[in-house]
């Protein structure tokens, strides 16, 4: 199986599939006719946003690694999240804080995603202290968010709610 095959090695994936069975997990590429298992990331983003909206959150931040074509599921999840806030007329109240593209030069790992949450939350809270919730694209980012908030003496969930997903 291949998890998140990027454009740069699609030819290799295609050659490999000629010799052995290959299943792509997430990031199915339309150019390849291979089996794939995909998560509906747009729906996941909408569900996350709907939960926050149902709890009364209006001013939220969304922290994500780079929204590049290499990891299109990130963009789908983010778009779904924003669409749900847009339906309520609150899209302008969502701050999307995106890591720089240098993060995607290597292979993303637990530490790099944690750092994205931690560092971008520190930046964010210097700029926007009136947020009611901060969302991490995934749980490792959410853990970084939590640690940054604790360090800044915010009480979670009393002062700010935090959400992540993906286990």
Each model region followed by its residue ranges:
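Central regulatory/effector-binding core of bacterial HTH transcription factors
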Residues: 1-8
């Amino acid at each position: 199986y291949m998890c998140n095959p990027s454009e740069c090695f699609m030819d290799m994936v295609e050659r490999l599939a000629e010799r052995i069975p290959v299943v792509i997990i997430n990031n199915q590429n339309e150019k390849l006719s291979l089996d794939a298992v995909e998560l509906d990331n747009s729906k996941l983003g909408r569900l996350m946003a709907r939960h926050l909206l149902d709890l009364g959150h209006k001013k939220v931040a969304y922290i994500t690694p780079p929204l590049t074509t290499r990891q299109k599921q990130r963009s789908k999840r983010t778009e779904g999240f924003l669409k749900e806030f847009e339906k309520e007329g609150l899209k302008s109240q969502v701050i999307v804080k995106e890591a720089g593209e240098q993060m995607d030069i290597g292979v993303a790992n637990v530490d790099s995603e944690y750092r994205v949450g931690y560092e971008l939350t520190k930046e964010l809270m210097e700029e926007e202290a009136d947020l009611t919730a901060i969302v991490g694209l995934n749980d490792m980012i959410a853990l970084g968010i939590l640690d940054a908030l604790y360090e800044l003496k915010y009480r979670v969930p009393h002062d700010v709610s935090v959400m992540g997903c993906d286990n």
